[in-house]
């Protein structure tokens, strides 16, 4: 007779056994297949995956002079699982010259996932960066006594010259946000922080390699796994060639010593930046090594803001350099002809409004107005343009046309230079004034914008680009610091011509005015050079002392260099702007300074401006 109770019990026992087996299978599958910790642990028992860092790309000036290169460095890495309970902490600390408290603090920070998001007990973690040669030699001899610790070879940046800090930038350790944004990086990695080191990070950094090492049961390295068949060699970063002429850059930094301001020089033939000086500056060689963080904090807290690249971040009234853009607009729109003459009896005076000007013959026509930097002429031009209802219908529509010309010349928006932090400046529009004056305004209300004052603000780069556009008689290339990336064509952003709305005929008259200025006008100091220079001064009004501004290019035909100089509180454009611009152009065109120019450069270097406040 069948015992159904026994049979039923057998089914239950069998079912329980099957469930237990299934649970074990699932757990084993989870451990071996799904568990990341298990995989890392299993790997670490037999293998050591050692990251090999690529050589970061070198940086050269336009003449092939090495500006930035690499030096070998050594980081100390730790695998927590391997050192637990096996490390003689006192011996370890003595070998590195650190305290036990510092050791314990560092180990806690490594384990803190809020500070080290990529932490794992089974993979290498950064313990100490940039061991000195002495510490490396000592540690290498004793490394067998410190299980779980390894030396990782890499490189650090070295800067050949004390120049071009704002252009080159620097390299520092990655932040948490850097790691979150790009999984290429791990804690302790380096990344470009400023300048072209930041903008061209992906080109410069290269690709990491991996070396898989085989270990025995005690964790001792036995050699490469499968003779290195699975290793991945690092790929070096790409070298960059700049448009910068390091000798021209050095001269510019020398000339701006003791002054706040900027110099930007551009080759108008291709838009490459020949020099970019921002003063005050700093020595890029001091932002390397273990003291980088301390030095960077000091610079960032300095009230004179030496980290600020005024060439692309400073937004200033352009003063009379802006008159060239007005001449181009009035001529092309038919508001004036080259022979149109306006009165200027020490300024523009109409309906109780007066804008002052220095003494010169009156009435005056276009070329002489540019040469002598007449305020009245350009005020009259804007007044007639914005007041021409028969042509535009309203002041708002006329203002929109005016702004379209300004935008086509590269104002009011970022030009797109290959450096981080560029500012756009300010070009007002009709909506701006409608809001400010509740729709009740006219050409007299905004007359100061015609002479580069009022609401108009440009960066020194935009002023230089205006000069390059005039040098080219109507077009510009987006200014760029890098001329060549190793193995890659230059981005088409930097090789396309950008034409303005102004006519070529208008540009020819503006060039004539700038040449006249260099011969007999406000830039006549340039007449001593044996190359045909063209220039335009600016004296930008300011709440304190006026700013000294200059924009020019040379030679007049087939120009090779365009330059903008901006010296805060420097007074007349001829006081600082013209002499600085002149010697810079001579240095680039001739390759050296004449004795007379060297004497002038020495005098300019020695001149200091007493700034009344340390807050800039």
Feature locations, PLM:
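Periplasmic/cell-envelope proteins involved in peptidoglycan metabolism and beta-lactam response
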Residues: 1-293, 315, 398-408, 450, ...
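Beta-lactam-recognizing serine transpeptidase/beta-lactamase-like catalytic domain environment
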Residues: 68, 216-221, 225-229, 269-321, ...
